[in-house]
Structures are given as C-alpha cells and as structure tokens.
From Swiss-Prot:
InterPro entries: Ig-like_dom (IPR007110), Ig-like_dom_sf (IPR036179), Ig-like_fold (IPR013783), Ig/MHC_CS (IPR003006), Ig_C1-set (IPR003597), MHC/Immunoglobulin (IPR050160), MHC_I/II-like_Ag-recog (IPR011162), MHC_II_a/b_N (IPR014745). Residues 127-220 are annotated as: Beta-2. The lineage of its organism: Eukaryota, Metazoa, Chordata, Craniata, Vertebrata. Residues 1-31 form the signal peptide. This is SLA class II histocompatibility antigen, DQ haplotype C beta chain. Residues 221-230 are annotated as: Connecting peptide. Disulfide bonds join 47-111, 149-205. Keywords: Adaptive immunity, Disulfide bond, Glycoprotein, Immunity, Membrane, MHC II, Signal, Transmembrane, Transmembrane helix. It is found in: Membrane. GO terms for biological process: adaptive immune response; antigen processing and presentation of exogenous peptide antigen via MHC class II; peptide antigen assembly with MHC class II protein complex; positive regulation of immune response; positive regulation of T cell activation.
Amino acid sequence: MSGMVALRLPRGLWTAALTVMLVVLGAPVAEGRDSPQDFVFQFKGECYFYNGTQRVRGVARYIYNQEEHLRFDSDVGEFRAVTPLGRPEADSWNSQKDVLEQMRAEVDRVCKHNYQIEEGTTLQRRVQPTVTISPSKAEALNHHNLLVCAVTDFYPSQVKVQWFRNGQEETAGVVSTPLIRNGDWTYQVLVMLEMNLQRGDVYTCRVEHSSLQNPILVEWRAQSESAQSKMLSGVGGFVLGLIFLGLGLFIRHRSQKGLVR
C-alpha cells in the first residue's frame, strides 16, 4: 500500500534552492537562449510512503514554464537533469557534497515528520459510502436496460464495486465512470450494468471500502408489468384518497365556522 501527501516545506535548504533557481533562470541567458521577460517557475515537493514509513521516497521537482527541467529523487541520491536547461544546475549541485547530504536528509526531516502530523487526520480519515440502484429508463421485461449503481460521498478514493445477477457476478456489460471528486474531500462513482430484464431476476450491487467492516449489498428486483400497474394504481388511489380527505376536512371546517356565526 502506498500513499502521497503534500509537503509542508520548512525554511531551509529547499526554500534556499528556490531562490538560487530563480536567480539562475532570471539571468539574461539560460542555456544559450534569451530568457523571456515573463516566466513561471514552480517547485513541487512530494513524499511517497510504502507500508507506512517503512519505506519513504522524496522527490523535488523544478519546473520552468510548465516544463520540468530538474529533479532530485532520494532513491537516486543526486540531482538529474530532465531537459538540457537543467544540466548546468545538476552538475553544479552534484559537485557540492554538503548540498547532496542535506537533500538526502530531507526524507527524514520533512517526509517522515509530516507523516506523523497527517496520520491522525488526513491519512486515517474514513467516510462510508452511500449506495443506491436505479434503472436508466422505465422497466420493460425482455428489453435491454441499464442499471446504475451510484456510490457516493466516500473517502478515501479506493473503492471496489461489483454487479451480481441472481448471485452470480456479472463482468460483461459493466461500465464505470471515472472517479468524481465532490470538492469536500469525498468521492463518487457510477457503475452501470447493461442487462435484459427477466421476471424474477435479482440484481445486487456490492461495494467494498476501507471505511466498512463488511461490504454493502444493495438489491434491485425486476417487476412484471402487471405488478408495476398494480403498484401505480395503488399509489394513485392513495393520492386521490388524500385529496378527497383534505377536501372533506376543508368543507367541514367551513360548515362549523358558519354555525358558530
């Protein structure tokens, strides 16, 4: 299992490195080319964790006008030029042993330190998903349809969604949307199953997530047209009854007010 969290960069070597790079890139000539009046310099510090902090990798990326040109990877142990623009800086910094030693030490000083800070909040955060099933169109027996299993509002992003028909896993005709970010540190995904409705079929959406002790199982049953008609008739009769009840109460209330007068 691996994870990545953003670095909180302390004042020190990496901040100083930014200043040096800005001075170099702001010079009139860089690698034999005129430097534009306006340019964008970016620095990205990344920490990768494998099995907690048993193995930690730190990567520093230097980006000029949206193109990475220089990189320090703790697994490599030295600076490497990604483009010709980064070669002079890589050669210069690799010749300074004190710089290399400090960069190698950043893995412990920054990555492992920040992991301990984030572990109790971001890394251990769990939000259980909500799972619902709905057909993409009105049910019709012996016709193709699409069942949509909506898995929403979960964190972290890793989730496993499976479709079953009468207890047997369905793999053909399964399509999933990309993972969707909700913008509040939760995610959602839609997993669709193309099927031919048959009376009595039972479809199950099974969801596994790290926030759950047991998988969530949501069932959906195909209904016959007569059953749907009966259900709609029952709902219609219930609504009509409520209307007449309300009308009767209203008339009675008006009559009582007339008697009081």
